[in-house]
Amino acid sequence: MAKKVALAYSGGLDTSVCIPILKEKYGYDEVVTISVDVGQPEEEIKRADAKAEKISNKHYTIDAKEEFVKDYVFPLIKANGSYEGYVMGTSIARPLIAKKVVEAARKEGAVALAHGCTGKGNDQLRFEAVFRQTDMDVIAPMREMNLTREWEIDYAKEHGIPVEVTKSKPWSVDENIWSRSIEGGRLEDPSFVPPEEIFEWTTSPEKTPEQPRIVDIGFEAGVPVSLDGEKMSGYALVKKMNEIAGENGVGRTDMIEDRVLGLKARENYEHPAATVLLAAHADLEKLVLTRSELKFKKIVDDQWSELAYYGLVDEPLYADLNAFIDKSQERVTGTVKVRLYKGALTILSRSSPNALYSEDLVSFDSQTIDQKDSEGFAKYHGFQARMYRKVMDKQ
């Protein structure tokens, strides 16, 4: 019986060179490649399919776009998911991709699982958090052979593997419907100014439309369900928001990121829809949740984001946090109006049937509340600080 290994396959340089390496260096008879569609460009999927058909023994392309948005992106929105300002597009997709690879591997009777992640990044941990739940061997050629980008390019040429990257432009790009990451090459120098050519989803602000774009975003139970009153599927909504916000230059991040291993990395991201939807959701929460809920949920959201960034979505705590978050989102229903203009996002208004805000009570022109009633509260506000000052003054 053929000795099979299942490889998480993107069609990029790293995973493409893994195919001959797994045969030549590791002794596997067959390499089964699995590409998981979580919203990459259609041409990227087709390119990966065409390449895999030539160099792998068998190839799967699994459509997980709607599942990704429904089960991973929407929970991220409800949790205001962010790690050091990063919207975690790559992070949140890896567990789903890994799970789909495991499913295909079992179907094929593979004895091992492989990925093309390096030993310096986070993705190795995210994939293996899922892979190591199985009894299959886990292979990481990039890490185990300590491979460099230049070596991979030369190796690919020797084996007739077409590559899109070059030694002068060795950008590593990862895309899904939630974000696009660009790293590698000169981008690793934090003092290097990224060339405009690395951006594809977002228009440079000086080239955006001269008129602002106003969008109404409808939410139900913490999840975006409509744009300008038009209801649509989760995937379609995120895709449309990417187009609208990207055209107006919204959603670029250039940051120094603390990886799980402790290394600092320079990262460039594009995430138009994520920028807008996360901001709109957080704003709506402020309208409908109590001060205590918002304060505690911030702690929960931060812990949720860290687990998601680490790829630990099978941790019991992750499910516990989601239970609280889901309960908190039951009232997060309403509409947020945003303006997108020259790279800037502005929240214009928000409304909800569950709003805790009362225009009548808060108005300076209203006498619904007798202002004198707050005098008793004011007398004791800062009471302990006053007592402390008296004690200190006696010393």
From Swiss-Prot:
Family of this protein: Belongs to the argininosuccinate synthase family. Type 1 subfamily.
Q: Does the keyword ATP-binding apply?
A: yes
This one is known as Argininosuccinate synthase
- Catalytic activities: L-citrulline + L-aspartate + ATP = 2-(N(omega)-L-arginino)succinate + AMP + diphosphate + H(+)
Give the EC number(s) listed in the UniProt record. Answer: 6.3.4.5
UniProt pathway: Amino-acid biosynthesis; L-arginine biosynthesis; L-arginine from L-ornithine and carbamoyl phosphate: step 2/3
Provide the GO biological process annotations: argininosuccinate metabolic process; L-arginine biosynthetic process; urea cycle
Major localization listed first in the record, in broad terms:
cytoplasm
Q: At the top level of its lineage, which domain of life is listed?
A: Archaea
Q: State the NCBIfam families in the record.
A: argG, PRK00509.1, PRK13820.1
- InterPro entries named in the record: Arginosuc_syn_C, Arginosuc_syn_N, Arginosuc_synth, Arginosuc_synth_CS, Arginosuc_synth_type_1_subfam, AS_cat/multimer_dom_body, Rossmann-like_a/b/a_fold
Q: Which sites bind L-aspartate?
A: T118, N122, D123
Q: Can you name the source organism?
A: Methanosarcina barkeri (strain Fusaro / DSM 804)
Residues noted as binding ATP in the record, renumbered to the chain: A8, Y9, S10, G11, G12, L13, D14, T15, S16, G116
Where does the chain bind L-citrulline? Answer: Y86, S91, N122, R126, S172, S181, E257, Y269
Q: Name one GO molecular function term.
A: ATP binding
Extract the Gene3D superfamilies matched here: Argininosuccinate synthetase, chain A, domain 2 (3.90.1260.10), HUPs (3.40.50.620)
